[in-house]
Amino acid sequence: MNRWVLLEHKILGSKLIDIHYDFLVEDQLDCFTWKFYEIPLLNKGFFKVGKQPNHRLVWLSRVEYQLSNNRGLVKRIDHGIFSNISHKQDSQELKIILNGKLLNGLFIIDGNFCQLTKNN
């Protein structure tokens, strides 16, 4: 169905809060997943990303969820449907059009970097 989601993941430690973002793209049986330390904004250049293990499809529909074993709180901050414009869709190279409120435009992941630009 080509769904995607951007999740804010807060891990509350004894003295500090670690915040990162998980970006999930639906694949047939699960979701390709990347970790961002900052949200890639439109036309602001390249942002570093880290490939994560694939996540279950259930994360595409969760709005907020408290993880077990003090692993933090996950909250959906953007989501939508994507259009794949690359010849392939895999975890190392991705070129899709996003239609979210925050992430809207041509989104490219190439290795450890991503970029969001205006969709022409």
Summary of predicted features, one role per range:
Residues 1-120:
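A charge-rich, low-complexity, intrinsically flexible signal that marks solvent-exposed coils, linkers
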